[in-house]
């Protein structure tokens, strides 16, 4: 086979340079870029952060007023629970009314806890903390060992001490 050696030549057209045609009839100013109708992530995050800060700072600016009637009711209910705990703990284990007294105490303590556990204003009070702890210890003992089982001396002393400190805190408004 005979090979033909051919060289490729590039053809370059000789055209005049292209000049854009300018129409001078009516030229309007350039249009502004189109408006965004969607939020960017940074816009959303800054909006979310601002709203979070505002909602949390509103609580400090205008705290909810606690009425004196609610405070008096808390003091009255708490004092009643304290006296019921003391009277139940002071009963002799041979007393035939121990089981009924324990049932009344559990009912009173459950209603007290259900009523005041939701109150955020009371959660930081020393009286609430001490009463709640003592009621938890008493209820836990009677649930575990039955209503006629006597509370051990050490646990009883701790419960009565918590009752005393809670009573002192109540008189001080804490």
Swiss-Prot record:
Xref: InterPro entries: PSII_Psb27, PSII_Psb27_sf
Topology within the bilayer: Peripheral membrane protein
A biological-process GO annotation: cellular response to light intensity
Compartments reported by the entry: Plastid, Chloroplast thylakoid membrane
Region annotation Disordered: where it falls in the sequence: 1-35
Keywords assigned: Chloroplast, Membrane, Phosphoprotein, Plastid, Thylakoid, Transit peptide
UniProt similarity note: Belongs to the Psb27 family.
Cited PANTHER family: PHOTOSYSTEM II REPAIR PROTEIN PSB27-H1, CHLOROPLASTIC
Sites bearing Phosphotyrosine, chain numbering: 132
Modification Phosphothreonine, positions: 94
Name of the protein in its database record: Photosystem II repair protein PSB27-H1, chloroplastic
Superkingdom in the source lineage: Eukaryota
Keyword Amino-acid biosynthesis applies: no
């Amino acid at each position: 086979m005979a090979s033909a050696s051919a060289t490729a030549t590039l053809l370059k057209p000789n055209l005049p340079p292209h000049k854009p045609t300018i129409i001078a009839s009516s030229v309007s100013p350039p249009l502004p870029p189109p408006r965004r109708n969607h939020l960017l992530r940074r816009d959303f995050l800054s909006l979310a952060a601002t709203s979070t800060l505002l909602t949390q700072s509103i609580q400090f600016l205008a705290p909810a007023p606690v009425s004196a009637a609610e405070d008096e009711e808390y003091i009255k209910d708490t004092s009643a629970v304290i006296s019921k705990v003391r009277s139940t703990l002071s009963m002799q284990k041979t007393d035939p009314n121990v089981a009924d007294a324990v049932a009344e105490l559990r009912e009173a303590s459950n209603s007290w806890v259900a009523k005041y556990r939701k109150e955020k204003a009371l959660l930081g009070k020393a009286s609430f903390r001490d009463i709640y702890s003592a009621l938890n210890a008493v209820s836990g003992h009677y649930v575990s060992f039955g209503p006629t089982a006597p509370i051990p001396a050490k646990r009883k002393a701790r419960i009565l001490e918590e009752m005393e400190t809670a009573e002192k805190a109540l008189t001080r408004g804490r």
